[in-house]
């Protein structure tokens, strides 16, 4: 078929596929505007440490508040509450979450929107079932928890919807099953092979994606490195893989 005979078909395809779309040739730079402001209701204002969207439609958000500066004078009167907001009502939280210590991280369970897990300033892990009120359904014990604030926590995508992993500046990655928080199910020390005193690297962020492999994850450290880890490496020494040094 000659090329000119394709043109009407291409035009119809373009009309159908790009219906309702138009090119913006304006010279105005991209912009955004504030829709709502969700303020800490506590008298002593705190830092927003973590935000997690409600997994079923994004109609709510859970926000963790804490003061992270050690020995900050404001900590004496600091509230430990964190909150869940309905995005259509920024004036009043829909629900309070009452941990034993202020939350540094907080995440909705992607498979069950009633469940949240959080890591506290005092190193404890707690989880909530929002159908049962503001108090944690369970909390780990001091002796088996992190020794520093829990900076990051992530739900794992496995056979159950109850597993998560946490990290802290104490140099540990701990795996948990929220149905039995008496002790972590596994532990990994973020060993720094370049450290003369074998001091572990402090974890400050944690990224897990099932697409990268169900046992693989990344940890960002306070030393500026990104550590690639494999939970199920055949050799325990290989659980820490590539270490990408900071600039």
Residue ranges and their predicted role:
Residues 44, 99, 146-149, 197-199, ...:
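Conserved loop/turn at the beginning of each blade in beta-propeller domains
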Residues 102-103, 135-158, 162-164, 191:
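Asp-box/WD-like beta-propeller blade repeats and closely related beta-sheet repeat scaffolds
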Residues 88-89, 131, 179, 232:
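Solvent-exposed strand-loop boundary residues in beta-sheet-rich modules
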Residues 28, 73-78, 85-118, 128:
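A conserved hydrophobic secondary-structure block that centers on an alpha-helix together
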Residues 50, 105, 152-155, 205:
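Conserved beta-strand position repeated once per blade in WD40 beta-propeller domains
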Residues 1-84, 136-140, 162-165, 171, ...:
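Acidic and/or Ser/Thr-rich intrinsically disordered tails and linkers
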